[in-house]
């Protein structure tokens, strides 16, 4: 049953308003929808485009690997993703934050990377791309003055349910902030000491639910998504990868590690095979650099 059916709406009826009584009457079904979408965010995005109507074809369609990425990132508290350029990893990571903000009211999330201006540009570009492809996301953002902000080195996206995510600097200036989860973008370039002593401790406090309670076991709380291309052994990012890999074996419900090569973007048409071949045929071709960038 589609949500519009629960609300008794269809194309032939004009929507006048949603009363408190109508919402109270369908609360059990709404809880089931939200619980389901938290596990299947790709289907939530499909729903935003079709309203649950099987006769409507969504304009934005996921590739199979993108659906896997979204589901893993939403279901596990600790996720480490090592993918090559052109894999849509930043696009999907920001989409995860937007889905979490919508489906977890009053949550506070972050994005950080080696440079604050770099993270601001990445987030702003991906949010605009997502909102253009799926306008329903844009309608969830609070665009009133003083709410959503977009600047050169700082962005904050506030949602109508009180949730928000922003970019935070990987520096001492971020000490004392409070968030429930976030993304470490291109973690291979982030200072490990700052990440351990400043950024990760911002997630000490769990999300305050709408009923005033906190649930430490909620996957959102202290959730960490590390996204990067391949780096080097003996670094903080490599040690973190090994830590998550061990947890994936010893505590499989807690952590997940994903990886991929240039072949998947080429197979799905996101990247040209001729471009990859030109890189290999270039006179300045460096096999080690190519392996890091394209064979993650």
Language model features: what each stretch is:
Residues 2-295:
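Phosphate/NTP-binding elements of NTP-utilizing enzymes
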């Amino acid at each position: 049953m589609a949500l519009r059916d629960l609300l008794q709406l269809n194309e032939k009826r004009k929507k006048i308003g949603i009363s408190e009584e109508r919402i109270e009457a369908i609360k059990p079904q709404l809880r089931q929808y939200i619980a389901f979408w938290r596990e299947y965010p790709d289907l939530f995005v499909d729903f935003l485009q079709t309203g649950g109507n099987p006769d409507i074809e969504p304009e934005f369609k996921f590739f199979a690997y993108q659906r896997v990425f979204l589901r893993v990132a939403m279901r596990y508290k600790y996720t480490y993703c090592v993918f090559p350029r052109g894999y849509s990893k930043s696009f999907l990571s920001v989409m995860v934050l937007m889905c979490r903000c919508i489906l977890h009211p009053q949550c506070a999330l972050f994005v950080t990377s080696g440079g604050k201006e770099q993270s601001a540009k990445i987030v702003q570009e991906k949010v605009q791309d997502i909102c253009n492809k799926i306008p329903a996301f844009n309608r969830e953002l609070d665009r009133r003055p003083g709410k959503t902000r977009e600047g050169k080195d700082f962005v904050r996206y506030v949602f109508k349910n009180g949730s928000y995510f922003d970019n935070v600097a990987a520096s001492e200036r971020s000490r004392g902030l409070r968030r429930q989860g976030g993304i470490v973008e291109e973690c291979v370039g982030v200072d490990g000491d700052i990440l351990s002593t400043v950024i990760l401790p911002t997630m000490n406090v769990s999300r305050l639910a709408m009923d005033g309670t906190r649930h430490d076991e909620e996957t959102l709380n202290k959730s960490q998504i590390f996204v990067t291309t391949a780096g080097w052994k003996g670094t903080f990012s490599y040690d973190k990868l090994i830590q998550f890999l061990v947890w994936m074996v010893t505590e499989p419900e807690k952590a997940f590690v994903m990886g991929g090569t240039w072949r998947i973007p080429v197979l799905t048409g996101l990247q040209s095979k001729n471009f990859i071949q030109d890189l290999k045929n270039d006179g300045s071709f460096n096999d080690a650099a190519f392996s890091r960038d394209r064979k993650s």
